[in-house]
Structures are given as structure tokens and as C-alpha cells.
A protein has these predicted regions:
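Glycine-rich adenosine-cofactor-binding loop
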Residues: 181
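Conserved catalytic-core helix/loop/strand module for nucleotide-ribose chemistry
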Residues: 1-176, 184-220
Length: 220
């Protein structure tokens, strides 16, 4: 969703910025490599799902200051009243779950935005005083340490975000869910959906009518 706003990078673009900082590409192992192709080849940044996690982890392990600087430089502090954000609030969903780090949703001028409370940490759920949430399950750029991007962040997610993960699982269990612009390659999303399918299969829920989910993706 954020990619529809000028200056906001995609997940791949953010990892490409980190890869360039440590001179990492797929060229050294590419079987299509030619001496003259390195600067124009589109395959050099065609990272696997595994690399999308390991590249930021390598940057962090090598230089934490560089890691956080790339994050802050790659994701601008934009608080635009994005039309798509406003359209989401017009639907008036029970809750909004986002993997984006920016503040485009909560900065919307849509009148319904005021009904929602931002949730970044487990403690935010415990202290919430509103009935609707914007759950930023991968953190917020205002606190770079909260961001879930590198491999270790994903490995530690279930331990560090116990309440948020449980809450998301409960929403997927008894709500109709609209996935808008999500990458179903996201490690957290795949794990949660896998858990949900397992629970349904173990309890015979596939044999009865159940709530459905909808997925909208950009074909590009």
C-alpha cells in the first residue's frame, strides 16, 4: 500500500539498498553472467526469499549503525494523506494489520482514523483504550529497534510479540479478512496462515462453512 506514495520503497528495493551498501549481488554465482552485463542485469538484485532476510542480517552483524542509517534514509518520514489509506478507513474495518513501518495510515485525515489506536508492542494491547487498532506487526520507524526485517527478527517474532501474534491469530479465526497488497511470501504471514490451516484441519473446520478471506494484489 505504501508503495503507492512517492518515495516509499518496496521490500525488495529496501533490501537492494542494503545489498549495495555491502557490495552484495547475485552476479558471482549467476550462470548467465557476462563481463559486460553487471551494470544492466536485472537478475543481480533478484533475491530469493532467504536472501531477503539474510542480507539485512549481514548488514546488521557487520555494522549496526549502517543498518539503522539505511532504514532511516530509505523510508522517508512521510505523513501524506494518501488516498488509499483513506479508502481503507472508509471500509471501517474492525482492525487494520500492516507490515509497513511508515506512518501513512495513522496520519490519514479520514474522519474514521480517530477511532483507531496504533499497536506496535505487546504492552500497547494491554494499555489500549480504544476498540479498534492499527496493528503494526513489523514495527514502526519511529523506533528502529522495533522493526522486523532481518532474519533474527523473524526467528524471534513469536517470543517477542506473543500477544500481538495471538491477537492476529484470533482475528484470522473469526473475522473476514481482506489482504491488500500483502506478500504471501512474508515469513510471519506464512507461519500464521499455516497455523490457522493446521488448526482447522485438526478440528474438522474444513468440512463446515467458515469465514473466508480475500486477497488483492498488484499484478505488476
Amino acid at each position: 500500500v505504501s508503495c503507492n506514495v512517492d518515495g516509499m520503497p518496496s521490500w525488495n528495493a529496501l533490501i537492494q539498498n542494503m545489498a549495495k551498501a555491502i557490495d552484495y549481488s547475485r552476479c558471482d554465482t549467476c550462470r548467465h553472467r557476462l563481463e559486460s552485463c553487471e551494470n544492466t542485469c536485472l537478475l543481480k538484485d533478484d533475491f530469493s526469499t532467504d536472501e531477503l532476510l539474510k542480507v539485512p542480517q549481514h548488514v546488521f552483524n557487520k555494522d549496526q549503525e549502517l543498518y539503522y542509517r539505511i532504514l532511516n534514509e530509505s523510508i522517508p518520514a512521510v505523513t501524506a494523506d494518501a488516498p488509499l489509506s483513506s479508502a481503507i478507513f472508509d471500509i471501517n474495518p474492525a482492525h487494520i494489520i500492516t507490515t509497513n513501518y511508515d506512518q501513512l495510515l495513522e496520519s490519514s485525515k479520514n474522519i474514521f482514523c480517530e477511532q483507531y489506536q496504533v499497536i506496535v508492542y505487546d504492552k500497547d494491547l494491554l494499555n489500549a483504550d480504544k476498540g479498534k487498532y492499527i496493528i503494526k506487526m513489523h514495527g514502526d520507524l519511529s523506533d528502529a529497534s522495533s522493526i522486523v526485517l532481518k532474519e533474527q527478527d523473524y526467528l524471534d517474532y513469536s517470543q517477542k510479540h506473543v500477544l500481538i501474534e495471538l491477537f492476529i491469530k484470533s482475528l484470522l479465526t473469526d473475522h473476514i479478512v481482506l489482504f491488500l497488497g500483502y506478500s504471501l511470501n512474508d515469513y510471519n504471514i506464512k507461519l500464521i496462515l499455516s497455523w490457522l490451516n493446521y488448526m482447522r484441519s485438526q478440528n474438522g473446520a474444513f468440512d463446515v462453512d467458515r469465514r473466508v478471506g480475500y486477497l488483492i494484489l498488484d499484478q505488476e
